[in-house]
């Protein structure tokens, strides 16, 4: 297990997949950042909006600045590197060039969703990381966007096979982010999950006092969002525990 105690969680995590649209930003902004409050977030991105669209401050980097990023990371206790799909290949080339640089990263999180093409890309991402001599136990899969009743081992047989057959990565049923509309709704509000959880406003009380229809609707929405955010947060706690143990 990483980290000395609950308050100081020292770990450096890279998030990547050759496929886009796997919810990388949800993972950087909502899963990792709130549980690693001191972490600096690096976004290695040439085209995507990245984590800054989710109410989280990021440092933007193009793939070529790899060397200076690795130097900076060596000085930090914890960091999150959010690598855009179109930059993964460059990022891996750089890791190869800067031999041993992957040792500065404790965990490679590879998020995936059910689509067949994405699953194939996920297998390729894991194999490419292994080809760089990154140890399988540092490569952790996060299954994203599964309904509550869906089982990851049934939905992702090829990835479970990769873990058991090739021993190429670590999979765990607990590392599953369940579908929750709170993530989409947060995106449209430009807020992070933590903002909702820490919002002290009693919206049910406000609803009773509201006179305008629009304000009433806003209060009802906020009550629902806060309820969803509690469920999402418990789910993410479980996922974080699974990928960092």
For each predicted feature, which ranges?
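Beta-strand-loop-alpha "switch" segments that mediate conformational coupling across diverse proteins
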Residues: 158-220
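Short beta-strand-centered segment that lines the nucleotide-binding/catalytic pocket of NTP-utilizing
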Residues: 37-50
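Inter-motif core of Ras-like GTPase G domains
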Residues: 92-115
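Conserved C-terminal guanine-recognition region of P-loop GTPase G domains, centered on the G4
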Residues: 116-144
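Glycine-rich phosphate-binding P-loop
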Residues: 13-28
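A conserved segment at the C-terminal end of the G1
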Residues: 25-38
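Switch II (G3) loop of P-loop NTPases
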Residues: 77-93
């Amino acid at each position: 297990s990483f980290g000395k105690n609950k308050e100081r969680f020292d770990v450096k995590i890279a998030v990547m997949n050759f496929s886009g649209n796997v919810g990388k930003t949800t993972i950087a902004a909502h899963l990792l950042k709130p549980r690693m409050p001191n972490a600096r977030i690096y976004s290695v991105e040439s085209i995507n909006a990245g984590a800054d669209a989710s109410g989280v401050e990021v440092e933007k980097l193009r793939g070529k600045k790899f060397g200076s990023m690795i130097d900076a990371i060596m000085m930090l206790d914890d960091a999150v590197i959010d690598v855009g799909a179109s930059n993964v290949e460059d990022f891996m080339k750089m890791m190869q060039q800067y031999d041993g640089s992957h040792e500065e990263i404790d965990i490679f999180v590879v998020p995936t969703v059910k689509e067949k093409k994405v699953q194939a890309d996920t297998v390729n991402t894991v194999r490419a990381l292994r080809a760089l001599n990154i140890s399988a136990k540092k490569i952790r899969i996060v299954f994203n966007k599964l309904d509550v009743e869906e089982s990851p081992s049934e939905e992702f047989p090829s990835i479970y096979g990769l873990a058991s057959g090739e021993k190429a990565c670590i999979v765990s049923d607990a590392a599953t982010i369940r579908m929750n509309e709170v993530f989409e709704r947060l995106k449209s509000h430009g807020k992070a999950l933590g903002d909702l959880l820490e919002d002290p406003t009693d919206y049910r009380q406000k609803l009773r006092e509201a006179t305008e229809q629009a304000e009433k609707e806003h209060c009802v929405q906020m009550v629902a969002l806060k309820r969803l955010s509690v469920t999402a947060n418990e789910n993410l706690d479980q996922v974080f525990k699974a990928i960092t143990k």
